[in-house]
Design a protein with these regions (language model features):
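Extended alpha-helical, oligomerization-prone segments that build pores/tubes and scaffolds
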Residues: 1-292
Length: 292
């Protein structure tokens, strides 16, 4: 008997619809647009994830006896994507692709509320976060940020934010055990382990083993045009720079020629004018003429 594939196809279509609904519900379309924008403009787009995220669903229940409506939120685990700006993405400088990276560092810029909310996420150290909050904001504005924020004329640009570094990569096994990471017996033969660490104000906010099986860096890097000798790709502006310079030169030349071709030509008998006069032409110009 020939097996029927129709039920399997229907199940696959329903699962595909579920995945699309979950991605739309977690702003995945916005994240992907951000990645594509930087890929085209800057040459490289970076997507992080997917991760599992506990989303709060707002729901209300009605008491059958009293008829009162009570707020009863529910938690639901959904996938989540994150767009990482290339300005906040620091890969292994010796790597030419994400597969070649030994480690990756992502920079976060969080306000006090966002940093405090990290206490509610798994494996974050509440005491270290409280200590970091008491130290105050530590964000250092980079030189390129004045151009990104369109504030080139501001001499002292400051941001009241916490600068947090998220590290994904390898760590010496002995150092990991010293830092408090519990290792399984199956890792006794390893010299190094893959970890995830969050650091702010010299405080370790989170330090865990890489949760993925098999272990991998949770970043997807998409260059617009691959540069085989560098990690980051080439975008449209850099790709068309030479052609744009040629077009700009022709435009300037056409304007200069138009200014000359559209100008007036005068024939002046200076013997009829008072000596020492300026020969420039402008509205309201008066030439002093000698009598005769």
């Amino acid at each position: 008997q020939i097996p029927q594939i129709q039920p399997a196809r229907q199940a696959a279509e329903r699962l595909e619809k579920l995945i699309h609904d979950q991605l739309e519900g977690t702003s995945a379309i916005t994240m992907l647009r951000h990645v594509l924008f930087e890929m085209v403009l800057l040459g490289t787009g970076v997507l992080k994830g997917p991760f599992t995220h506990d989303e709060v669903l707002h729901a209300w229940d009605t008491d059958e006896e009293t008829g009162e409506t009570m707020y009863n939120p529910k938690a639901k685990t959904v996938p989540k994507l994150e767009a990482v700006s290339v300005w906040d993405f620091y890969p292994d400088p010796d790597a030419t692709s994400i597969e070649d990276c030994d480690y990756v560092i992502q920079r976060h810029s969080l306000n006090r509320t966002q940093l405090r909310n990290l206490k509610n996420r798994p494996f974050f150290r509440k005491k270290a976060i409280s200590e970091c909050l008491s130290m105050g904001e530590n964000y250092e504005v980079r030189g390129f940020e004045t151009s990104l924020l369109d504030r080139e004329n501001v001499d002292d640009l400051k941001k009241k934010r916490f600068e947090i570094y998220e590290y994904w990569g390898s760590m010496d096994k002995a150092l990991a055990e010293e830092a408090g990471i519990e290792l399984d017996d199956s890792m006794n033969d390893l010299d190094e382990v893959q970890i995830n660490a969050w650091i702010c104000n010299n405080q370790v906010l989170r330090l865990v083993l890489n949760p993925f099986t098999p272990e991998r860096l949770p970043f997807h890097v998409c260059p617009y045009e691959i540069n085989p000798y560098q990690f980051f790709g080439v975008g449209i502006p850099e790709n068309m720079e030479d052609a744009q310079m040629v077009m700009n030169g022709h435009a300037r030349m056409a304007i200069d020629n138009l200014a000359l071709a559209g100008n007036l030509v005068f024939d002046i008998d200076e013997t009829q004018l008072v000596p020492g006069q300026d020969m420039s032409i402008y509205p309201g110009k008066i030439f002093r003429r000698q009598s005769g």
